[in-house]
Amino acid sequence: MQRQLAALGLEQAPRLLDVGSGGGLPGAVLAIADPALQVRCVDAVAKKALFIGQVAAALRLPNLQGLHARVEQMVQPHDLVLSRAFASLADFTRLSRSALAPQGLWLALKGKWPQEEIAALPPEVEVFHVEPISVPGLDAERCLVWMRLRA
């Protein structure tokens, strides 16, 4: 992630939006791991967003915020909009587009290489990198799908 953000010149306090964050994965973990990140976790379920706020307060994380909202209501620009288990790639990019900064990136954690989902993306969304990952203790395929708006 840091490599992709650095390529955009976003080493200093990049703004991340974790869509459908639920209990804070991966948003809260990223906020803990890198205090320079400004992480906002948005969820349509109020108690989930409230939990993120409680985590931020309990762990004294000024760089973590929980928001009770629908992602399509988000208009503040974010350098990286990410999701772990939110929607198809097409729905994820469509619903979160208003929250993406002009040079921003989307990042989605998926299971198997999502060839059909990639093929269903609108022409203005470009997949520029798919990174296979392994999760210790989990015998399953996972990958990170990096996307951006075409220039």
Question: What name fits each language-model region?
Answer:
Residues 1-83, 93-94:
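Conserved SAM/SAH cofactor-binding pocket of Class I
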Residues 38, 63-65, 105, 126-129:
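Conserved beta-strand segments of alpha/beta enzyme cores
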Residues 56-57, 97-99, 122-123:
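Short, solvent-exposed amphipathic alpha-helical segments in soluble enzyme
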Residues 71, 86, 135:
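Hydrophobic pocket-lining residues within nucleotide cofactor-binding pockets
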Residues 103-113:
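Conserved beta-strand signature within the Rossmann-like core of class I S-adenosyl-L-methionine
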